[in-house]
């Protein structure tokens, strides 16, 4: 049986390597076979098991519709198992999208706090285990060195140790966000929203590789903005991102004062630059199909200049903390402009402190005139409205969403069709994200297989998506270690200590620490090295792709190191002699490690290898 399990692991690993590319079969029923076999009798000189001659015509094994649905779900989710593929095939793609749009939103912040509260509780409960190990270490030291007295701790000494132990727990920080994101991705059914939010997180970027990393709630609350607006309006998304305390810290318009020349203080220009360059209109004026406009001399036309950045920076002055951190009981004062980030409520948006806002008139972007004397929030909303209505937004954001969901090199016609939907959803509304996402997924260029073999089609699936799909579709169990400690006294002979390992199958906690995956393949949500994401949309790998003017963003993090490391991760995932697919940091607190359960797949393989291969091809 072990040899069969190893063979299954090898086949699964092989299918995961092949799954880097999105392949499918063209659905076509206009031919003999696939069930079009009325009046035809097929005979064969030899038949065995399921390989009956009549199956060559009667549609047995014809999975084109399910393979196409599997391809669709690989674009729209983090991974779908056979049951979901079959269900989605029955109801159809458009009905599936509608179903997804109407699902309740699974926000990360409540889950983040639930996780932290459980860790705090289990940390306190685990003190006895820590104390038993501590006393055993003292006993071992005294045994090895006769000059060291064996321990016999007093209750006062134990209480002091317990107080110190409780102080060692740090958080919540980025680790708890990683736990919450992983568990939500693995557990929740609102997969399209989860996938779109992940795409948006690579466009409207913040990163835990900053001060935000010390505050998990700042990451989860920001991600909730992306979840909330995934099917909303892009204008509302852009405004809420601009007011996010997390974004304010990351791109430094939090506590951004108006100019004070006598103190040589000028408004910070960071967010003003990036909200144009990366979050809305890009660097150059675009046609609706995403190609660059040219001036009379044939040069690209910039969308803004340095004066525009300076003027827009004045707009984003005066934003500060909305309230103080409710988890810090020692804070008894109200929030104020200039309050340290560490003392503020990271889950609330910034508010305007009018006395710190530049109230003079602003003129920018060849047409936006903001009059003097206005409230600061009015200035900001005018600027956001102007950016939102800029003709670049549709092709600039639409192309990147296509890249994140469908393909790296969408045709100009594809981009233009998405731009048209962004500009008008058919009901006179601009920026309708639900309509845009549906149009991207259902566009003929996304659904047809006719051009799959063309050199400019497809995309390199990033390592996070490849790994997530495998983690979601494979059957899983948990390995949990339970400890029982009794103290008769606090000496070498006073401890009764037992542990037991059990397997759990229900209510698994998919708490992936994320950092190990990031270290291996250079990617995990909200861990990009800069505001420019893990890769730029216009990245061109050196060689044939660059020579053919093709883009391959994901190739930026695909090198000899990450490629080998990803194979190593697959090996750990699939090798049956490893204890876990991933480790959380808290197994010592009684939290389970996640393992794959190959028993059912092994039984299928033993009974019918052909069916097993069929399952693996549909899944991955």
Enumerate the predicted regions with their spans:
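Bacterial N-terminal signal peptides that target proteins for export
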Residues: 2-10
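Bacterial N-terminal signal peptides
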Residues: 11-20
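Boundary at the C-terminal end of the N-terminal hydrophobic targeting segment
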Residues: 23-25
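N-terminal mature-domain "stem" immediately C-terminal to a signal peptide or N-terminal signal-anchor/transmembrane
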Residues: 32-106
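Active-site substrate-binding loop specific to GH73 endo-beta-N-acetylglucosaminidase modules
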Residues: 39, 44-48, 89, 135, ...
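Flexible, low-complexity segments enriched for small/polar residues
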Residues: 45-46, 51, 70-77, 204, ...
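Structural motif
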Residues: 59-67, 172, 187-194, 266, ...
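N-terminal accessory alpha/beta regions
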Residues: 80-227
């Amino acid at each position: 049986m072990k040899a069969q399990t190893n063979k299954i692991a090898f086949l699964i690993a092989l299918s995961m390597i092949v799954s880097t590319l999105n392949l499918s079969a063209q659905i076509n029923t206009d031919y003999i076979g696939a069930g079009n076999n009325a009046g035809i009798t097929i005979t064969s000189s030899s038949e065995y098991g399921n390989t009956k001659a009549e199956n060559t015509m009667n549609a047995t094994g014809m999975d084109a519709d399910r393979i196409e649905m599997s391809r669709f779900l690989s674009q729209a989710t983090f991974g779908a198992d056979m049951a979901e593929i079959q269900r989605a095939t029955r109801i159809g793609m458009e009905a599936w999208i509608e179903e997804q749009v109407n699902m309740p939103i699974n926000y990360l912040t409540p889950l983040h706090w639930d996780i932290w509260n459980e860790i705090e509780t289990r940390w306190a409960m685990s003190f006895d285990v820590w104390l038993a190990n501590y006393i055993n270490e003292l006993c071992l030291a005294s045994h090895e060195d006769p000059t060291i007295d064996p321990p016999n701790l007093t209750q006062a000494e134990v209480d002091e140790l317990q107080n110190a132990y409780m102080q060692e727990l740090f958080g919540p920080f980025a680790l708890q966000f990683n736990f919450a994101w992983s568990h939500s991705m693995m557990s929740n059914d609102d997969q399209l929203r989860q996938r779109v939010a992940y795409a948006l997180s690579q466009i409207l970027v913040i990163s835990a590789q900053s001060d935000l990393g010390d505050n998990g709630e700042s990451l989860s609350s920001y991600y909730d903005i992306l979840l909330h607006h995934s099917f909303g309006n892009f204008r509302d998304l852009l405004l809420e991102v601009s007011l996010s305390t997390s974004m304010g810290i990351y791109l430094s318009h939090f506590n951004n004062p108006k100019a004070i020349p006598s103190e040589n203080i000028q408004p910070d220009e960071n967010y003003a630059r990036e909200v144009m360059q990366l979050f809305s209109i890009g660097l150059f004026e675009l046609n609706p199909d995403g190609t660059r406009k040219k001036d009379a001399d044939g040069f690209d036309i910039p969308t803004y200049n340095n004066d525009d950045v300076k003027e827009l920076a004045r707009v984003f002055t005066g934003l500060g903390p909305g309230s103080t951190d409710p988890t810090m009981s020692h804070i008894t004062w109200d929030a104020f402009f200039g309050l340290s980030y560490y003392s503020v409520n990271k889950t609330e948006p910034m508010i305007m402190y009018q006395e710190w806002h530049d109230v003079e008139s602003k003129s920018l972007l060849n047409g936006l005139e903001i009059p003097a004397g206005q409230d600061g929030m009015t200035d900001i909303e005018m600027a956001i409205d102007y950016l939102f209505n800029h003709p670049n937004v549709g092709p600039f954001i639409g192309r990147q969403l296509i890249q994140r969901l469908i393909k790296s090199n969408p045709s100009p016609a594809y981009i233009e069709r998405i731009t048209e939907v962004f500009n008008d959803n058919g009901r006179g509304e601009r920026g309708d994200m639900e309509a845009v996402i549906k149009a991207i997924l259902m566009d003929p260029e996304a659904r047809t297989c006719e051009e799959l073999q063309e050199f400019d089609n497809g995309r390199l699936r990033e390592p996070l998506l490849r790994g997530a799909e495998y983690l979601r579709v494979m059957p899983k169990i948990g390995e949990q270690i339970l400890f029982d400690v009794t103290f008769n006294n606090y000496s070498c002979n006073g401890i009764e200590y037992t542990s037991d390992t059990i397997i759990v199958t229900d209510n698994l906690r998919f708490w992936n620490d994320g950092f190990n995956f990031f270290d291996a393949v250079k990617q995990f949500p909200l861990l990009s090295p800069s505001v420019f994401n893990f890769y730029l949309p216009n990245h061109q790998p050196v060689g044939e792709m660059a020579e053919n003017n093709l883009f391959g963003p994901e190739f930026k993090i695909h090198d000899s190191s990450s490629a080998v490391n990803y194979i190593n991760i697959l090996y750990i995932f699939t090798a049956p002699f490893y204890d876990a697919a991933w480790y959380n940091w808290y197994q010592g607190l009684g939290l389970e490690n996640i393992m794959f359960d190959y028993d059912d797949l092994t039984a299928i393989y033993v009974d019918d290898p052909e069916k097993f291969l069929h399952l693996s091809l549909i899944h991955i």
